[in-house]
From Swiss-Prot:
Annotated Gene3D superfamilies: Metalloenzyme, LuxS/M16 peptidase-like
One biological process term in Gene Ontology: pyrroloquinoline quinone biosynthetic process
Active-site residues annotated for this sequence: 60 (proton acceptor)
Source organism of the structure: Pseudomonas syringae pv. tomato (strain ATCC BAA-871 / DC3000)
Family statement: Belongs to the peptidase M16 family.
A molecular-function term among this protein's GO annotations: metalloendopeptidase activity
Record's keyword terms, sorted: Hydrolase, Metal-binding, Metalloprotease, PQQ biosynthesis, Protease, Zinc
Pathway: Cofactor biosynthesis; pyrroloquinoline quinone biosynthesis
Name of the molecule in the record: Coenzyme PQQ synthesis protein F
Free-text function comment from the UniProt entry: Required for coenzyme pyrroloquinoline quinone (PQQ) biosynthesis. It is thought that this protein is a protease that cleaves peptides bond in a small peptide (gene pqqA), providing the glutamate and tyrosine residues which are necessary for the synthesis of PQQ.
Length: 779
C-alpha cells in the first residue's frame, strides 16, 4: 500500500459573500452528473420564542406551500419531484437546512424556486391552519416513535434549564395560528433570522465556478440584507449537584462537555470515527469478544457554542454497565496518548469519502463546513476533549468503581486493506449477485449480515457501497462505487459467506427498534409480494448453500477487471444459474396482506404491478407514476389532510415494475386509507385528459439520459431490466417507448391499472375489514 494517498483534484471550491451579506460556497466537480443546493439558516428550534414551541419547525413547513409566483403545481417540491430529483428540509436545535438535487438542466429553475420560497413566503392564515394539522399528525407519530421516546428519557439527565429539555416539536395546541401575538412572533422570527447575513448557501455540480457564481448572484440577491444575529448561549448541560435522573446504561452512556475550543467539531468527528472502528484490539471488538454488547455507536447528540453531548449507544447483552464504563474509560486513556498515529489514515479516509460524494453530499459538506480533516486547531480541541471525557463527565450514570479492574490490551486499528492509491479519474462499476433459496431464511441472513458488518464499513471507506439484502426467497449482494477495490471486496465477502462461524445463532444480531408503521411496511413489501407460503427455516447454512442457485450482473468493468471478477465469482457458494431469471408470477385481482404494528397509527401500501414486463408497459407505468405523484400528494396530504407520510412512485421488485402508493395516518383506519387511494386511482383518466403529455414525456425521458443519471441509478435500472429479460441499452429503449405514448394509449394503461390487470397488493398495518370489497371496482 502506498504511504500516502493524494487528495483528489477534481473538485474546486470558491467562497464569496454577496452584497446583501449572503455567504456562498461554490463547488465544481467535473465527475458529477447532477447539481445540488444546500442552504443553512443559523436559527433553529432553540431560537424560537418560549411562548410558541415548534414555531421554527412550523415555519420550515410553511415555506413549501408555494408562493405567489410559484403556486402549488409549480413550487419547489413539485418541480423537483417532476424532474426526478430529491428535496427536503430539516429543523435542528440551532440550524434549519433546505436542500435539493436536480439534473443540471433543471438546476437553475430549482434554485430560483428555493430562493423565492424563502424570500417571499405566502404564509396565509388558511395555509397555516392546514399545515398545522400536518404538523400535529407529525407530532403524534413522533410521540409514538420508540426512538423519540428513548431520546426523551436520555435527555432527562440534562439540566432542566437547558433548552434540550424543552418541547420543540409543535402541535395543534402550541401553534395558536389565529392569535395575533402568534402571528407577530412568526413574522418577527422570520424577519430576524431569514435574512442574508444569517444564511449560507452552497451550490455544487459539474458547472464551472463562473456559472455557479452567476446563479448564486442572480438568485441569492433575493434575500433581504441584514446583520449577523448572535444566537443566545444555552444554560450548562450538567446541573450541580448531578441530576438524580438515571439513564438506561444498557442502552446509553452520555458525556457532557463544556467550553470546548474552536474546531471541536473536527475533534469529535475524529474521536467518533475511531471509537466506532470495529477492528480487533479496539473498544467494540473487545466488548463483543467478552460478550458484553452486540453493538456500539458513538455520535454527537448535540453540539453548539462549545457544548457537547456525546452519546455512546449500546446494545448490551446483560447488566454489565460498570464493566463497560471501565473499559470505555480505559480505552479513552489509551487513545489520549496514541491518537497522533492515526491522523494520516484518517486524512486518507476523508479524502476518499469526498472523492466519492455526490452533489448533494458535497453541497452539505461545504455549506455546513463539516470536518474532513484534523487540523492543528482540531488537534488542540481533541486534547481538551479527551481531558474532559472522564467519569466526571458522565451524566445520568452511577459512579464508576474499580477503574483498573477490567483493563484490556488495547491496540490501534490496522490500515484499511482496500484503501489504495487510486487515480483521480478511476471509474465506477457495479456488481449484483443474487441467490435463489428453496425458502426464506431470515435468521441465517441476519447472522451472515452481522458477519459482513466490518467488511461493509471497510468497503465504504474505500469507496465501495456493499449491501447484503434479503427479500422473498432471495439473498442479494450489491456493490456500487470505485471499480479498483471491488474484486478484492467481493472476494472477502464470499469468503465470509462461505465460512460462517459455527455454533448456535444466538448472537446473530439484536432486534432493532420498531419502525414507524409505513417504514415497517416498506421494509417487508417485497416479502409480501414474493412469498406465498410459510418458510421452512433451518440453521444449516451448508444445506442452504447446497440447494441455492445464483446469478450475477456487472457493469462498468473493463476486460481485464472483468476477468478478475469472473475468477473471484468462481468461489460463490451454490450453483450458477444458466437459464434466464424467472419473473414473479402475476396474481390477478386485489389481495390484502397485513404486517402487525403496535403503533396507534395506521399505514397502507398499495403496489400495482404492470401486467407484463415489456418495455412498453414499463414506460407507460413510469409515465403514470410521473403524472400522478404531485396530484396524489396534493389530494391526500394537503386537501384531505390524512397525515404527513404520503408518497407515490415506481417500485421494482425482482424485475417486476409497479406503481406504489403509501399513506400513514393518525386519524384514518387502514380500510379508509385504502379507499382514499382507490378513489384517487379511479380519477386517473380525468388527470390524463388535462395533462400536457408531450411536455411531461419530455421531462421524464430526460431523466433516462445517461448524462443526467448517477452511476448507481443507471446500474439499478439495468439490473432490474436484466431480471425482466431485457438486455443492453434499456434506458434508450425506455426513451423510445415513452416517445410513442399519447393520450389514447395512456388512457388504456390507466384502465389496466384500475382493472388491476397486473394485480394489486395491499399491505397494511391492520387486517382488512369485511366491509372493504376487494373485487374489481366498477368504472
Amino acid at each position: 500500500m502506498d504511504a500516502l494517498m493524494p487528495a483528489p483534484q477534481s473538485a474546486d471550491l470558491r467562497r464569496i459573500t454577496l452584497a446583501n451579506g449572503l455567504s456562498v460556497a461554490l463547488c465544481h466537480d467535473s465527475r458529477l452528473k447532477r447539481s445540488a443546493a444546500s442552504l443553512r439558516v443559523a436559527a433553529g428550534s432553540h431560537d424560537a420564542p418560549l411562548a410558541w414551541p415548534g414555531l421554527a419547525h412550523f415555519l420550515e413547513h410553511l415555506f413549501f406551500l408555494g408562493t405567489e409566483r410559484f403556486q402549488a403545481g409549480e413550487n419547489l417540491m413539485t418541480f423537483v419531484q417532476r424532474h426526478g430529483g430529491q428535496v427536503n428540509a430539516s429543523t435542528r436545535e440551532r440550524t434549519t437546512d433546505f436542500f435539493f438535487e436536480l439534473p443540471q438542466t433543471a438546476f437553475a429553475q430549482g434554485l430560483e424556486r428555493l430562493c423565492d420560497m424563502l424570500a417571499r413566503p405566502r404564509m396565509t392564515v388558511a395555509d397555516q391552519l392546514r399545515e398545522r394539522e400536518v404538523l400535529h399528525a407529525e407530532f403524534i407519530a413522533w410521540r409514538g416513535d420508540a426512538n423519540a421516546r428513548d431520546q426523551l428519557r436520555l435527555l432527562a439527565a440534562v439540566n432542566p434549564q437547558h433548552p434540550l429539555r424543552g418541547f420543540h416539536a409543535g402541535n395543534r395546541y402550541s401553534l395558536s395560528v389565529p392569535n395575533p401575538a402568534f402571528q407577530q412572533a412568526l413574522q418577527n422570527f422570520y424577519q430576524r433570522f431569514y435574512q442574508a447575513a444569517q444564511m449560507t448557501l452552497c451550490l455544487s455540480g459539474p458547472q464551472s465556478l463562473a456559472e455557479l457564481e452567476t446563479l448564486a448572484n442572480t438568485h441569492g440577491a433575493l434575500f433581504a440584507s441584514g446583520t449577523k444575529v448572535r444566537q443566545h448561549a444555552p444554560a450548562p448541560l450538567m446541573k450541580h449537584p448531578t441530576s438524580l435522573e438515571h439513564i438506561d446504561e444498557q442502552k446509553h452512556l452520555l458525556f457532557a462537555c463544556e467550553h470546548l475550543p474552536a474546531k471541536a467539531d473536527e475533534a469529535v468527528a475524529f474521536l467518533c470515527h475511531w471509537l466506532n472502528a470495529a477492528q480487533p484490539g479496539g473498544l467494540i471488538a473487545t466488548l463483543i469478544e467478552r460478550g458484553l454488547i452486540e453493538s456500539l455507536n458513538a455520535t454527537p447528540l448535540y453540539q453548539f457554542d462549545g457544548q457537547l453531548l456525546l452519546d455512546i449507544e449500546l446494545n448490551a447483552n446483560r447488566p454489565s454497565a460498570s464493566t463497560i464504563k471501565s473499559l470505555l474509560l480505559s480505552w479513552l486513556r489509551f487513545f489520549k496518548t496514541q491518537w497522533p498515529a492515526l491522523i494520516e489514515e484518517y486524512q486518507r479516509l476523508e479524502q476518499r469519502r469526498l472523492q466519492m460524494s455526490g452533489a448533494l453530499t458535497l453541497a452539505h459538506h461545504h455549506c455546513r463546513e463539516l470536518p474532513a480533516q484534523l487540523s492543528d486547531q482540531g488537534a488542540d480541541a481533541l486534547r481538551e476533549l479527551l481531558e474532559q471525557l472522564t467519569s466526571n463527565a458522565l451524566i445520568g450514570s452511577a459512579p464508576v468503581d474499580n477503574l483498573d479492574s477490567t483493563l484490556a490490551e488495547w491496540r490501534l486499528p490496522a490500515p484499511n486493506p482496500f484503501l489504495e492509491s487510486i487515480a483521480e479519474d478511476s471509474p465506477e462499476a457495479a456488481l449484483y449477485l443474487r441467490w435463489e433459496l428453496p425458502s426464506a431464511q431470515p435468521t441465517l441472513w441476519q447472522m451472515l449480515n452481522t458477519r459482513l458488518t466490518p467488511l461493509i464499513e471497510d468497503a465504504r471507506q474505500a469507496g465501495v457501497n456493499l449491501t447484503f439484502s434479503a427479500y422473498g426467497n432471495y439473498w442479494q449482494i450489491q456493490l456500487n462505487g470505485l471499480r479498483a477495490p471491488m474484486v478484492a471486496v467481493i472476494e472477502h465477502a464470499l469468503q465470509r459467506l462461505r465460512h460462517a462461524a459455527p455454533g448456535p445463532l444466538t448472537h446473530a444480531g439484536q432486534a432493532s427498534e420498531p419502525l414507524i408503521p409505513v417504514r415497517q411496511l416498506l421494509k417487508h413489501l417485497a416479502d409480501h409480494y414474493l412469498i406465498s407460503k410459510q418458510a421452512q427455516t433451518t440453521g444449516d447454512l451448508h444445506t442452504v448453500w447446497k440447494h441455492s442457485r445464483w446469478i450475477s450482473f456487472a457493469s462498468g468493468f473493463c476486460a481485464a477487471s472483468q476477468l478478475q471478477l469472473n475468477t473471484a465469482l468462481n468461489a460463490t457458494p451454490g450453483t450458477r444459474q444458466t437459464d434466464v431469471p424467472t419473473l414473479p408470477a402475476i396474481r390477478l385481482g386485489k389481495r390484502w396482506s397485513s404486517e402487525a404494528s403496535s403503533s396507534s397509527e395506521n399505514a397502507v401500501l398499495v403496489f400495482c404491478p404492470a401486467p407484463t414486463a415489456s418495455v412498453e408497459d414499463e414506460a407507460a407505468w413510469r409515465l403514470l407514476a410521473h403524472l400522478l405523484q404531485a396530484p396524489f400528494y396534493q389530494r391526500l396530504r394537503v386537501e384531505l389532510q390524512l397525515g404527513y407520510a404520503v408518497f407515490s412512485g415506481i417500485r421494482q421488485i425482482a424485475g417486476r415494475t409497479g406503481l406504489l402508493f403509501g399513506v400513514q395516518s393518525p386519524t384514518c383506519s387502514a380500510d379508509q386509507l385504502f379507499q382514499h387511494i382507490e378513489a384517487f386511482i379511479g380519477r386517473l383518466p380525468a388527470l390524463i385528459r388535462t395533462a400536457d403529455l408531450p411536455e411531461q414525456i419530455r421531462v421524464l425521458s430526460a431523466q433516462f439520459d445517461p448524462a443526467n443519471m448517477p452511476d448507481q441509478q443507471q446500474a439499478d435500472i439495468h439490473w432490474q431490466a436484466y431480471l425482466a429479460g431485457h438486455r443492453a441499452h434499456h434506458s434508450q429503449a425506455l426513451q423510445r417507448a415513452l416517445s410513442n405514448l399519447d393520450t389514447h394509449s395512456l388512457l388504456a394503461t390507466a384502465n389496466q391499472l384500475i382493472d388491476a390487470a397486473g394485480g394489486w397488493l395491499i399491505v397494511a398495518s391492520r387486517p382488512a375489514s369485511a366491509a372493504v370489497p376487494l373485487s374489481l371496482p366498477e368504472r
